[in-house]
Amino acid sequence: MKTASKFSVMFFMLLALCGCWDVKDIEQLSFARGLAIDETNDHQYKLTYQNLLPQSEDSQASGKPEFVNVTSHGKTILEAVSDVSIKDPPVYSDHLKVILLGEKLMRNQNVDQVLNHFIRDDELRRSSYLMAARGNAADVFTKGNPNQQQPMPSEKLIDLTTHSGYNGKIMIPLRIGRASVYSQNGYSYLIQAVKNEKGKAKYDGAGIIKRGSNKLVGFLSADETQTLSWVMGTIQGGVMPTTDKGHPITFEIKKSKTKIKPVIENGKPVFHISVKTKGILTEDQNPNENSFSKSYLHRLENIFEKKLERDVKQVMDKLQHEYKTDPVFLSDHIRIQHPDYWNKVKGHWDEIFSETDFKYDISFKIINFGTVGK
């Protein structure tokens, strides 16, 4: 009986030891935080991993870089990933937080197919952010002055995702898992655009991925991106600058609500878009007016309303007639509210969208004007 008990104890001890069968020696791994993917002139993939370097107190004091860029090439994504180990430690992707796709790659190739390996890979998290580079993606991962202590570019891109509550020109972060769902379900969508400006990574508008081809068809400016965030009801903050009789005025967004109601008229959809925004008059350089005056505030509200309506019309016209695609998910409103009509048009929705009419009801409410009236 005692012998049986001893064997039982030994058996369970062996099971516990087996729990470390897949252990990885961290000194033999590269911890990637960002990955830039570009298409080369010979149509191969160029991968640029941005890897963390271990930092001691001495290395921080001496100003040694905290990251290193590791580049590899391959005819397929996986070949390029595996070729990293030829010259550097294998990449450990558990900490990979942002994937940046180059402009040439996205214009020429199906984005969903490019991401196929990363969606299948159980080591990489689907919550990693997806962004579009204006130009080469690898350029965004470089810094201007190599002798200066600067933030890791990929870390900066990650940190900036939290700023959408302060600046409406920053999109709600798009994750690779969500992008794959959009592509698989036949949606066009927007993707945060970034660029290298004088050696620093900077958010700069949005790229448009078109349904069907899943390719990049163009970019929107930062201002146009903010306008579409208003239309989609995703705007969380930011400002709208304009002028009153030549004097600068600025409205700070505190709360905004969007309602979209499609109706079918003569066999065509008409979208009624209502946007109601509350905020603060944070800047008023008109020396001849008084913010304590209700009539003056109403006039300014009307100025902001007309500006937003003008901006919305311009960017929607661009989507309809230049890019001919719906990256703001208006199709969902048709699908949900008019399912029979949707079944007839879903196969050629982009063509229907290009001929769609819009009616706008935009209102601004100034709820505060700061600590001074003039």
From Swiss-Prot:
InterPro entries: Spore_GerAC-like, Spore_GerAC-like_C, Spore_GerAC_C_sf
Signal peptide: 1-19
Subcellular location, principal: membrane
GO-annotated cellular components: plasma membrane
Biological-process GO terms, alphabetical: spore germination
Lipidation feature positions (N-palmitoyl cysteine): C20
Pfam families: Spore_GerAC (PF05504), Spore_GerAC_N (PF25198)
Protein's cellular compartments: Cell membrane
Keyword vocabulary terms for this entry: Cell membrane, Germination, Lipoprotein, Membrane, Palmitate, Signal
Keyword Protein biosynthesis annotated: no
Covalent lipid sites (S-diacylglycerol cysteine): C20
Membrane topology value: Lipid-anchor
Function of the protein: Involved in the response to the germinative mixture of L-asparagine, glucose, fructose and potassium ions (AGFK). Cannot stimulate germination in the absence of gerD and gerK gene products (fructose and glucose receptors respectively).
Family assignment from sequence similarity: Belongs to the GerABKC lipoprotein family.
NCBIfam families registered for this protein in UniProt: spore_ger_x_C
The protein's name in its UniProt record: Spore germination protein B3
Organism: Bacillus subtilis (strain 168)
